Amino acid sequence: MAEARLLRRRRLCLAVPFVWVVAVAVSRVGANTEGDALYSLRQSLKDANNVLQSWDPTLVNPCTWFHVTCNPDNSVIRVDLGNAQLSGALVPQLGQLKNLQYLELYSNNISGTIPNELGNLTNLVSLDLYLNNFTGFIPETLGQLYKLRFLRLNNNSLSGSIPKSLTNITTLQVLDLSNNNLSGEVPSTGSFSLFTPISFANNKDLCGPGTTKPCPGAPPFSPPPPFNPPTPTVSQGDSKTGAIAGGVAAAAALLFAVPAIGFAWWRRRKPEEHFFDVPAEEDPEVHLGQLKRFSLRELQVATDNFSNKNILGRGGFGKVYKGRLADGSLVAVKRLKEERTPGGELQFQTEVEMISMAVHRNLLRLRGFCMTPTERLLVYPYMANGSVASRLRERQPNDPPLEWQTRTRIALGSARGLSYLHDHCDPKIIHRDVKAANILLDEDFEAVVGDFGLAKLMDYKDTHVTTAVRGTIGHIAPEYLSTGKSSEKTDVFGYGIMLLELITGQRAFDLARLANDDDVMLLDWVKGLLKEKKVEMLVDPDLQSGFVEHEVESLIQVALLCTQGSPMDRPKMSEVVRMLEGDGLAERWEEWQKVEVVRQEAELAPRHNDWIVDSTYNLRAMELSGPR
């Protein structure tokens, strides 16, 4: 008996290490499979700029590679290779990235077909293959991506018909298949009923209701038949009276319906006039691309006549109201407050169109607008998690503080959104008021840049030279304040201040700091603490010990590079994105330190009472170490 028990114990002791090894192996299988899949992609692509140099197959998993983001379980959830000057072809192994949510390959020179295996990426939220050289058909399997919200395949050479399976994606919000060689009838059911001809433009062989061209053999486009309510049941004794009344009513309805249908048909033949000539109160269903023109009455009903109880916030451009549309969806309605001048309507509409064309997952999508002789309103999706500013400083007692990992995601996401405005919009869009209050948070706490384009929109009554400085004290770049001239580098400055808000949880301008003899400007306050080597005092107390020290230092370095006094010395937002992804920050910081060594002797004493212009003096080189 004793020998038998001893034998069982020995077997158990041998089995436990074996089980542990198997468990470790299993935990790495997913990461290794994903790493192999991404390395296959690297081998298939031509990388002229060595952006994939860090994709090393000898590493345990791909989570340390540049342009790859993983979740806490070390599974790949994001691949960002937009505008990387890549060529070559995609590989079917991409279908093994089971947890992938974002696949961004836009603005490259990738060719070949879109792999059917992408349909296996059932967690995908965004698929952006815009501006490449893809050929062949759109895979039918993409209809399996039931979480997809953002699909851009435009500006390629895709052919064949649009798969009807795509209509089953009920979550789809943004669709662009324009500028391809697609043919056949555009589906009009399911999610496709939301999309208008701009989503399918410049595909000469496409036809159907989603385009401006009817399909061969199909009747001309016509308005839907009028709704006929069911006839109520009447007793036999009233049948004759009902018949007579019904006949009179039918005749009257016909008398009024025929001219109305004819007028509607005539207007459908002239869609180019919809945007400019139709008053919103008379035709709320006018669209510009995917942009809806709402009636004022519709927005009054949605916001309970702009009730104060529905105010979400107030800003330099007006008040924002929470509203609920007739379909039940929640929206944020921005009621612009600028006075109206004659002749501004066309410019307003042009700027609204420009804003609507800026589509990126980190930009707040404009859903619609309303314009009357006395009102200008913009309609956006409602962001349930509010703004970064409200989450940092106005959260409810039951709301947890923003975790450090969430803050770093916000930093990167907002940088990507601003980079898109600067580098991918034509003409480029300068925000001019980048701050934590204008960075919104969606249901997944992803950063969404809001209020972009509004500064230009509100200057439509001015000349081409903008004379008004728009922005918020503490965020305004010194050159913008002194000259009134804005550029993308003024946005970079505001972004740097926003990073400091994320790190510290404090306001960019706060008179309350005077009570402790501190600087009212956040940038000056941060620099003062760094000079005193009190980096730990910078971190938001709400985080307690839940932050990564070297990541805090990296974010501070990026913030200081972004807030340099000279706009020429600040990085571009695209460079900021790369630095946040771990590419080039050490080199840029070292270069900055060398310059500071030269400047040290000439550095002036700090100013304590400069409340308007943020300090542009840089720190001594030794006051913040490089990455550890």
From Swiss-Prot:
SUPFAM superfamilies: L domain-like (SSF52058), Protein kinase-like (PK-like) (SSF56112)
Post-translational modification: Autophosphorylated on serine and threonine residues.
Tissue specificity: Expressed in flag leaves. Expressed in roots, shoot apex, leaf blades, leaf sheaths, panicles and flowers. Expressed leaves, stems, sheaths and flowers.
Residues recorded with modification Phosphoserine: S329, S356, S387, S615, S625
EC numbers: 2.7.11.1
Regions crossing the membrane: 243-263
Superkingdom of origin: Eukaryota
LRR repeats: 97-121, 123-144, 145-169, 170-194
Topology with respect to the bilayer: Single-pass membrane protein
MF annotations from Gene Ontology: ATP binding; protein serine kinase activity; protein serine/threonine kinase activity
Residues the record lists as Phosphothreonine modifications: T303, T350, T463, T466, T472, T616
Listed GO CC annotations: plasma membrane
Note: Plants silencing SERK2 exhibit strong reduction of percentage of shoot regeneration from callus. Plants over-expressing SERK2 show enhanced resistance to the rice blast fungus Magnaporthe oryzae. Plants silencing SERK2 have compromised XA21- and XA3/XA26-mediated immunity to the bacterial leaf blight pathogen Xanthomonas oryzae pv. oryzae (Xoo). Plants silencing SERK2 display altered morphology and reduced sensitivity to the hormone brassinolide.
Entry function: LRR receptor kinase involved in positive regulation of somatic embryogenesis and defense response against the rice blast fungus pathogen Magnaporthe oryzae. Involved in the positive regulation of receptor kinase-mediated immunity. Required for immunity mediated by the LRR receptor kinases XA21 and XA26/XA3 which recognize effectors from the bacterial pathogen Xanthomonas oryzae pv. oryzae (Xoo). Required for the immune response mediated by the LRR receptor kinase FLS2 which recognizes specifically the bacterial flagellin (flg22) effector.
Subunit structure: Interacts with BRI1. Interacts with XA21, XA26/XA3 and FLS2.
Name the UniProt record assigns to this protein: LRR receptor kinase SERK2
Organism: Oryza sativa subsp. japonica (Rice)
Gene: SERK2
